[in-house]
């Protein structure tokens, strides 16, 4: 083709689509963001009819052209793509326009291909499928011919285009018929009428697919006609006609421009590239262009092949990770995929024998359903979790007005209805035939979730009752045990039954019948009530046996003894006059205290019948029973039960401790009598008054003493009145502290001086004598 810097071969002679088309677009537009602001134009016509020459003159492209002086032969092979932003107009030969991509299609009816019309048909169909404007280039003398003006080819192209793209009713293509070498003898209007009549006749004879029976040519195409003078004989007029044609392409005024919004595919360049490639692949693999009507013997093979292609298309477009939280989104996507697949199948397979076509269609639908079930199951798993979480949330919300069993029934029905509605949406849209397995699985999961929440609610109710019973025991029964009477256990059991009854009152249905409102049967409710009473008796057992230990029993006896010993029947403190009175009170108080020892040691009613729980008790640790026989470390068996509180040895030790403390109390009482009987006699005070009267009168009669006494009294009064004791005491303390510090320092100085004198004395030199000198002096003296 010569220089091809500004054009690439979009489809080569081997019918292969150029994979570097997108890079070519990027090279053309560079860094500009073109978006959808571009147009695509194709030219179609007989070989050597001047198509490339027209494009070069009109759009300033550089497509190779034929040198007629040398030889008339095929110049354009395949489909070539060029780019321009300049167009020839009457005003300017280089008028700037939007990006135009021009397709130069290999000419039809060429000697090189002979009777092989497969490529020219596919090329024409491809040009119609991807272009906004298709220029049909023909000579004036070809008008009225059937083969010469490509009407037979246009019929085939129209038919296949209608079957493949008939559903795109919102898209049109402009067919611009350019009549070349128009000498003006036959008016353009006459040529236009002839061509329109031929096109309408072709359209009416088409085998239209379902849904397009009543469609017309103008539903899919707009028709425009123009004429160009002879390029060689009338070159100036030819260029003028070309520029007039350029005005229509460059104009942006509605009604005058060749471009309309409905012509555009509304795809960015990269999207258009993909679209063009897909269109060519679809056209290239559409074997119906070259095959006659299929026989019934091959119908099954063809429909199966088309079915596999349709399923492959679905799998190709199926998202790898399809996660939709909304039902409408998922259903819409799946419905779109199914429609795409079945439409692909129906488009091609419906042309074959209907029974075979329908059988394979049902098989294809079943395969689609199996694929959809995988995605729907994942979606339903997410919805199950959400619904079960909502059930749990509804059941955990506190509501005093609505019983739990009512909430559970309502929540279960709400969740089950919501899930069934989800399933109904999928089946109603015919995405799947049935989802009974998923429905059954959700019902089981829902029952399990409700059962779990029921157990939790029951556990909370039992714990709440146990806490209420435990609180009542600690408050009410503690007081009874701390202040025991002979009918202690009658009162304890009465209070205990009252506490249990109050705690379970809201669940009582009838006498000895209870409903814990979690959906249990009558028998199960009775078992729960038995468990509640067992917990209550266990709490009472642990509290009684924990409180009435040996030390606490001694304290209770001591308190009971002291209340009787120290206070009279009017709760007034006793004033002892003699030891006999103390001894009598001691005897009575001791008997009063010890009379409840048996009561505190053994739990029995006023009829002396041991108290036995009406349900078995357990400690909660491996169901260890709190009652019955047990073996101690020495291998001796003992009876363990609710009524047995203190053993005989514990009672004996408690009595000994109590007597020891009671004796101490008596001794203190007797000592108080001794202190009151050894006080100073009254006559001593009388003697002090008589003998000291004179001294008292001396003080009273001395004015100095009286004045000093008055001053001190007045001073003390005002100090007290003004609340000055604190400052005075602080001042006195400060003065005393300073005095002490000063005296301490003086004493330290004196001691330091004495120490220094002693040191100096010890350091004075002393006269030393040798033993020989002493001997000499001794001898001298003797002589």
From Swiss-Prot:
Location of the protein in the cell: Endoplasmic reticulum membrane
Topological domains annotated Cytoplasmic: 1-679, 725-783
A GO term from the CC aspect: endoplasmic reticulum membrane
Chief localisation class: endoplasmic reticulum
Binding site for GTP: 45-52
Annotated GB1/RHD3-type G domain residues: 35-265
E.C. number(s) listed in UniProt: 3.6.5.-
Family affiliation: Belongs to the TRAFAC class dynamin-like GTPase superfamily. GB1/RHD3 GTPase family. RHD3 subfamily.
Naturally occurring in which organism (per UniProt): Lachancea thermotolerans (strain ATCC 56472 / CBS 6340 / NRRL Y-8284)
Protein name: Protein SEY1
Annotated transmembrane regions: 680-700, 704-724
Topological relation to the membrane, as annotated: Multi-pass membrane protein
Enzyme class, spelled out: hydrolase
CDD domains: GBP
GO biological process, one term: endoplasmic reticulum membrane fusion
GO molecular function: GTP binding; GTPase activity
UniProt xrefs under Gene3D superfamilies: P-loop containing nucleotide triphosphate hydrolases
HAMAP family linked: Sey1
Region named Disordered: 752-783
The UniProt record lists the keyword Transferase: no
Known function: Cooperates with the reticulon proteins and tubule-shaping DP1 family proteins to generate and maintain the structure of the tubular endoplasmic reticulum network. Has GTPase activity, which is required for its function in ER organization.
């Amino acid at each position: 083709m010569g220089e091809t810097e500004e054009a690439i071969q979009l489809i080569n002679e081997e019918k292969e689509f150029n994979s570097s088309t997108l890079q070519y677009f990027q090279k053309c537009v560079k860094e500009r963001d073109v978006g959808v602001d571009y147009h695509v134009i194709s030219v179609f016509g007989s070989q050597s009819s001047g198509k490339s020459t027209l494009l070069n003159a009109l759009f300033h492209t550089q497509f190779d052209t034929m040198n007629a002086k040398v030889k008339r032969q095929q110049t354009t092979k395949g489909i070539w793509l060029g780019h321009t932003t300049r167009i020839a107009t009457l005003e300017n030969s280089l008028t700037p326009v939007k990006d135009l991509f021009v397709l130069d299609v290999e000419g039809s009816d060429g000697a090189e291909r002979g009777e092989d019309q497969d490529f020219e048909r596919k090329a024409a169909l491809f040009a119609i499928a991807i272009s906004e404007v298709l220029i049909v280039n023909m000579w004036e003398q070809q008008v009225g011919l059937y083969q010469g003006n490509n009407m037979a080819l246009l019929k085939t192209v129209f038919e296949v285009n209608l079957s493949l793209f008939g559903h795109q009713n919102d898209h049109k293509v402009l067919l611009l018929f350019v009549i070349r070498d128009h000498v003006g003898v036959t008016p353009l209007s006459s040529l236009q009428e002839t061509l329109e009549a031929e096109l309408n006749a072709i359209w009416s004879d088409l085998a239209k697919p379902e849904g397009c029976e009543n469609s017309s040519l103008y539903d899919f195409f707009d028709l425009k006609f123009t004429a160009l003078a002879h390029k060689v004989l009338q070159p100036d007029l030819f260029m003028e006609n070309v520029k007039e044609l350029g005005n229509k392409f460059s104009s942006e005024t509605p009604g005058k421009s060749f471009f309309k919004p409905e012509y555009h595919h509304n795809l960015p360049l990269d999207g258009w590239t993909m679209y063009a490639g897909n269109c060519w692949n679809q056209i290239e693999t559409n074997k119906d262009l070259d095959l006659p009507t299929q026989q019934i013997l091959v119908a099954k093979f063809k429909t199966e092949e088309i079915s596999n292609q349709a399923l492959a298309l679905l799998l190709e477009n199926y998202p790898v990770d399809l996660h939709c939280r909304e039902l409408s989104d998922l259903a819409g996507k799946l419905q779109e995929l199914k429609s795409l697949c079945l439409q692909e199948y129906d488009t091609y397979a419906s042309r074959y024998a209907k029974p075979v076509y329908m059988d394979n269609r049902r098989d294809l639908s079943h395969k689609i359903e199996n694929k959809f079930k995988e995605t729907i199951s994942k979606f339903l798993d997410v919805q199950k979790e959400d619904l079960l979480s909502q059930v749990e949330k509804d059941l955990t919300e506190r509501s005093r007005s609505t019983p739990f069993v009512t909430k559970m029934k309502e929540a279960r029905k709400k969740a089950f209805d919501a899930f069934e509605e989800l399933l109904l949406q999928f089946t109603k849209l015919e995405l799947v035939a049935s989802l009974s397995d998923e429905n059954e699985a959700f019902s089981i999961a829902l029952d399990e979730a409700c059962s779990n929440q029921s157990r939790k609610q029951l556990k909370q109710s039992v714990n709440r009752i146990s806490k209420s019973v435990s609180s009542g025991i600690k408050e009410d029964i503690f007081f009874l045990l701390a202040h025991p009477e002979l009918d202690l256990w009658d009162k304890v059991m009465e209070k205990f039954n009252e506490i249990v009854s109050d705690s379970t009152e809201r669940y009582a249905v009838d006498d000895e019948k209870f409903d814990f409102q979690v959906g249990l049967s009558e028998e199960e409710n009775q078992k729960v009530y038995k468990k509640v009473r067992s917990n209550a008796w266990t709490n009472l057992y642990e509290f009684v046996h924990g409180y009435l230990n040996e030390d606490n029993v001694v304290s209770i006896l001591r308190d009971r003894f002291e209340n009787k010993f120290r206070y009279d029947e009017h709760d007034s403190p006793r004033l002892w006059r003699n030891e006999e009175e103390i001894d009598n009170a001691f005897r009575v108080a001791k008997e009063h205290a010890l009379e409840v020892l048996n009561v505190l040691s053994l739990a029995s009613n006023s009829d002396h019948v041991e108290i036995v729980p009406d349900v078995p008790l357990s400690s909660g640790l491996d169901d260890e029973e709190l009652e019955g026989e047990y073996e101690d470390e020495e291998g001796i068996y003992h009876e363990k039960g609710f009524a047995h509180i203190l053993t005989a040895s514990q009672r004996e030790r408690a009595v000994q401790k109590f007597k020891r403390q009671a004796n101490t109390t008596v001794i203190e009482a007797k000592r108080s009598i001794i202190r009151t009987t050894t006080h100073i006699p009254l006559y001593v005070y009388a003697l002090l008054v008589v003998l000291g009267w004179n001294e008292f009168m001396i003080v009273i009669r001395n004015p100095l003493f009286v004045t000093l006494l008055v001053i001190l009294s007045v001073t003390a009064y005002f100090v007290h009145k003004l609340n000055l004791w604190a400052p005075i005491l602080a001042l006195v303390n400060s003065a005393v502290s300073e005095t002490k510090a000063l005296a301490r320092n003086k004493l330290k100085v004196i001691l330091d001086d004495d120490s220094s004198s002693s040191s100096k004395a010890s350091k004075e030199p002393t006269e030393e004598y040798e033993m020989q000198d002493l001997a000499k002096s001794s001898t001298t003296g003797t002589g």
